[in-house]
């Protein structure tokens, strides 16, 4: 099922504590909200050229998002009230075990932390930190897209880096898996990766190594779901490495261009399609 978003190009998507889907419109400077079955509501941000990208729920009942081009981290309440904080090239963002929001600074090789309006930044080894996720060990785990590595930062700022076996892997997004490990996608190598909290890494090649996997999330079925940007497909991988792929609906003659994805309030997988829609995919057996 497709929900067309006439206001622009969806990029990031997440389910909020209010039971709605929240998404970013990267080229229009907007954040949208959709209750499944209803019409979307779009909130225009103060800066049209901010490039809102990743969005995630915070511990405070609001949604938090990054504006990569505008250099801001934003907070939006269910009623649409927006607060912005200056940050350097923020991209990935997630709530940490300490109740703070943690985010990556892609162009300055830093990890940022914001709580109660106070911003702290931690230097990480060069490599363009991109996606970030909260691990089962209370640390934050992040990808180093140009460093071909996975990083770990404790709540106190101690950093460890785990190089990937594959050169040119270019990992992007990362998520906490159902098995106590972190799972990530390698857009450059066409692989899905797994790293446990001891640093042990396993990589699973996709059937099409040119699929350019972009984002990944744990599904309600105990598997990992991921987008394949180049091929317009949705992938599913079990914790033992079995891979399935599903075609996403196209809008007219345009390819889907899937980016972010989330488990919706209805238990389905919702995918942000940059060509102007949100796709809903039923989880088999649900």
Segment roles from a protein language model:
Residues 3-7, 44-48, 84-88, 122-126, ...:
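Surface loop/turn motifs at the tips and blade-to-blade linkers of beta-strand repeat domains
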Residues 6, 21-27, 63-69, 101-107, ...:
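Conserved beta-strand positions in repeat-built beta-propeller and related beta-rich domains
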Residues 9, 51, 69, 89, ...:
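Beta-rich catalytic cores
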Residues 15-18, 57-60, 95-98, 134-137, ...:
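Residue-level detector of Asp-centered blade-edge/turn motifs that repeat once per structural unit
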Residues 30-32, 71-74, 109-112, 148-151, ...:
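A short loop-to-beta-strand structural motif that recurs across blades of beta-propeller domains
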Residues 34-38, 76-80, 114-118, 153-158, ...:
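Short loop/turn segments that connect beta-strands within beta-propeller blades
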Residues 251-286:
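Blade-level signature of beta-propeller repeat domains, shared across WD40, Kelch, NHL, RCC1
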């Amino acid at each position: 099922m497709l929900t067309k978003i006439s206001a622009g190009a969806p990029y990031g998507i997440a389910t909020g504590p209010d039971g709605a889907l929240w998404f970013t419109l990267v080229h229009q400077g907007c954040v949208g909200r959709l209750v499944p079955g209803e019409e979307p509501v779009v909130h225009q941000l103060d800066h049209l050229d901010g490039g809102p990208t990743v969005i995630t729920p915070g511990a405070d009942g609001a949604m938090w998002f990054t504006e990569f081009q505008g250099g801001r981290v934003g907070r939006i309440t269910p009623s649409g009230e927006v607060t912005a904080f200056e940050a350097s090239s923020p991209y990935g963002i997630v709530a940490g075990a300490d109740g703070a929001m943690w985010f990556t600074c892609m162009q300055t090789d830093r990890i940022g932390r914001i709580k109660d309006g106070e911003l702290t930044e931690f230097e990480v080894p060069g490599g363009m930190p991109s996606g970030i996720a909260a691990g089962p060990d209370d640390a934050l785990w992040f990808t180093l897209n140009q460093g071909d590595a996975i990083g770990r930062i404790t709540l106190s700022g101690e950093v460890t880096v785990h190089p990937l076996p594959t050169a040119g892997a270019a990992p992007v997004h990362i998520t906490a898996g159902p098995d106590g490990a972190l799972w990530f996608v390698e857009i450059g190598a066409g692989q899905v990766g797994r790293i446990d909290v001891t640093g042990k890494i396993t990589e699973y090649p996709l059937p099409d190594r040119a699929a350019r996997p972009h984002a990944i999330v744990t599904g309600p079925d105990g598997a990992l779901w991921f987008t394949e940007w180049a091929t317009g497909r949705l992938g599913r991988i079990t914790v033992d490495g079995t891979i399935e792929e599903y075609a996403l609906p196209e809008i007219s003659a345009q390819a889907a261009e899937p980016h972010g994805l989330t488990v919706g309030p209805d238990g389905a997988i919702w995918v942000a399609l940059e060509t102007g829609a949100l796709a809903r995919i039923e989880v088999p057996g649900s």
